[in-house]
Structures are given as C-alpha cells and as structure tokens.
Amino acid sequence: MMLRTWISLPMVLLDAYCFCIFVSCSISTTTAPVEWKSPDRQIPMNITCANYSGTVNGNVTFRGLQNKTEDFLHWLLGWGHKSICSFFPKLQGNKEQHYMYGITNLTYNCTYDRLTLLNLTTENSGKYYFKREDVNSTFYYSCYNLTVT
C-alpha cells in the first residue's frame, strides 16, 4: 500500500503542476484556517491566519469553517472593517437573506461557506475573515492571509 502511494505521488504532483500552468490557480502555502472563538465579539488579537498565495489574473477560493443553518455568516476584508458579503438565516417564515457589498478593485463570488476572489490583482493581497455568529451570540473567526504576485 505504501509503495502504491509513493508511485502515484509524482503523478498527482504532475497533475497539479500542469493544472496550475494551464489554468489560473493559487496554492495554499501553510496551515489550514482555524476557527477562533471571540469572547468580546472582536477579531482575536492573537489569531493565526492561514497563508495563501495567488497569481495576478488568477483565482483563489477560501472555505469557511463549520456553520449551521441558524448562524449569521459574514466574509470580511482587512481587520473586519469592510463587509464583502453576509448571510442571515431563515427566521420565522422569512427567506434566507444574502447581501453582497461593492468593494473597489475586488471581483468575487460569495456563498455561505466559500469566498472566491476572481481575476486577482496585487491590490487584493491582505487579510480576509470568515465570521460566524451562533444563536447564542457567540462570535467565531477564521483568518486567511493572501499574497498575490
């Protein structure tokens, strides 16, 4: 079994390399994002960000961490001062509400658990956050640090 894994590893790496050469892509460069609980509703000062790299004109997708249908979800830019998009759950007969906000020099698609940045520029480098608020008004954050070259 181990031998089969080692034999197939170069093929997987070659596939990833060929995909990145012929299709715009970015590759996660370090650890996966971690969800941090915030006791004061603010982004924790000691939060650790997952590092991502991207190429100009490429795309990158960040995945939000766990959520439930009753959670309020937000994708944020910078230190959380700019909202990219928000999702509000179905509340007593209402439909789920989804808001997308215009951000200068940022082209994106947003879903409740993914943020895809499109046609990257170096101006898109920086920190992005996934914020989740549960029914008990407890806030959780995940951090993504993007470098575009």
UniProtKB/Swiss-Prot annotation:
Chief localization: virion
Membrane topology category: Peripheral membrane protein
PTM section of the record: N-glycosylated and possibly O-glycosylated.
Annotated localization: Virion membrane
Similarity remark: Belongs to the RL11 family.
The entry's keywords: Early protein, Glycoprotein, Membrane, Signal, Virion
Record GO cellular component, one term: virion membrane
Keyword Phosphoprotein: no
Glycosylation sites: 46, 51, 59, 67, 105, 109, 119, 136, 145
Segment forming the signal sequence: 1-18
Name of the protein in question: Envelope glycoprotein UL4
Coiled-coil zones: none
Gene of this entry: UL4
